[in-house]
Each structure stands twice: as structure tokens, then as C-alpha cells.
């Protein structure tokens, strides 16, 4: 799923309002994927929809602009960092189950490491504890143990 890999690697910067889908796809995929605070839910949902639809079609033109008011979007609120980290772990577990055929795919492992890096350092602004880092690393370990330990030790240095 090229769209998913590009999204995980940060090559696509998109928001939920930019996706259009049919009721048929929504029903066949089981609706929206639910995680706490809707964190990672859009990425998981679009991946599931794309899998059921056989891909995603991009329309040419200008990107969609929408307002993201600071403090009004629960997913961006620093007060929910613990919930967001837990949702990230659930997302990684969901990815492992949904894409079990690609567990050993180096491109997927790299994309997941990029995604985790972005979440820990940018989205969560480094507001997480060692237990949270361990949890995310172990969830990644369900794909690749080496990537899990690399991720853990790379981010562990922030606690020193």
C-alpha cells in the first residue's frame, strides 16, 4: 500500500477532510478504526479503506485547507499525551494484524520507524516517559526486534 508507506514516512501530509469514500467501502472495511482520542485513527482507517477498495485515487489540484484551532482539536492537545501514546501502541498492534503479510518488509519497518520518530519528537513534543517509550518500542518489536531496540535506544538518549 504505497499511500500508507508514504503517509508513515511523512511524504504525505493529509487530514481526514481530504478523503472521500463510498458507503460500500465504509461498510466492507468495518467503518472507522477506533483508537483513544482518535489518535492514529485516520491513518488506520484510510489504510483499511484503501485495502478494501484496491487503492486510493489522488485528485489533481490544490491541497485542501482547513482550520486546526489550537486547543480545539483533541488529538493535538498536550493534555492527552499519555492517551495519544497508548493509541500509538494500539495503532502499531493494529498494523501488525492488518498487514501481517508484510511483517518482514524492510520498507514498512523503515516507514514505521519514521512514523514513531515523528510522533515521539514532534507530535508529543518529547512528552513521554520511559515506560511509554518501552511500550511503543515493544509494539514495533512485533514487526522487527532490531527496529524496536534501535527505536528505544535512539529515543532513550533524551532521558539522559
Language model segments and positions:
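Conserved nucleotide-sugar donor-binding catalytic segment
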Residues: 1-79
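Alpha-helix C-capping/helix-to-loop hinge sites
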Residues: 11, 29-32, 98, 102, ...
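A general structural signal for well-ordered secondary-structure junctions
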Residues: 32, 55-56, 101, 118, ...
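Catalytic core of nucleotide-sugar-dependent glycosyltransferases
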Residues: 38, 62-70, 76-105, 130-141
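Short, conserved alpha-helical segments within structured domains
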Residues: 41-42, 108-112
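Residue-level detector of alpha-helical secondary structure
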Residues: 89, 96, 113-116, 153
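Amphipathic alpha-helical repeat scaffolds of TPR domains
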Residues: 110-122
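Membrane-interface aromatic/basic loop that binds lipid-linked glycans or pyrophosphate carriers
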Residues: 120-160
Amino acid at each position: 500500500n504505497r499511500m500508507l508507506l508514504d503517509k508513515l514516512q511523512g511524504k504525505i501530509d493529509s487530514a481526514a477532510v481530504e478523503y472521500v469514500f463510498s458507503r460500500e467501502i465504509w461498510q466492507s472495511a468495518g467503518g472507522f478504526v477506533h483508537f483513544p482520542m482518535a489518535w492514529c485513527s485516520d491513518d488506520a482507517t484510510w489504510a483499511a479503506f484503501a485495502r478494501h477498495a484496491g487503492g486510493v485515487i489522488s485528485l489533481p489540484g490544490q491541497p485542501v485547507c482547513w482550520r486546526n484551532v489550537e486547543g480545539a482539536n483533541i488529538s493535538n492537545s498536550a493534555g492527552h499525551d499519555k492517551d495519544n501514546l497508548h493509541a500509538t501502541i494500539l495503532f502499531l498492534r493494529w498494523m501488525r494484524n492488518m498487514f501481517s503479510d508484510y511483517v518482514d518488509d524492510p520498507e514498512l519497518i523503515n516507514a514505521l520507524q519514521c512514523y514513531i520518530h515523528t510522533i515521539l519528537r514532534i507530535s508529543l513534543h518529547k512528552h513521554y516517559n520511559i515506560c511509554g517509550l518501552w511500550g511503543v518500542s515493544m509494539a514495533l518489536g512485533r514487526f522487527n526486534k532490531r527496529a524496536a531496540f534501535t527505536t528505544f535506544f535512539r529515543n532513550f538518549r533524551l532521558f539522559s
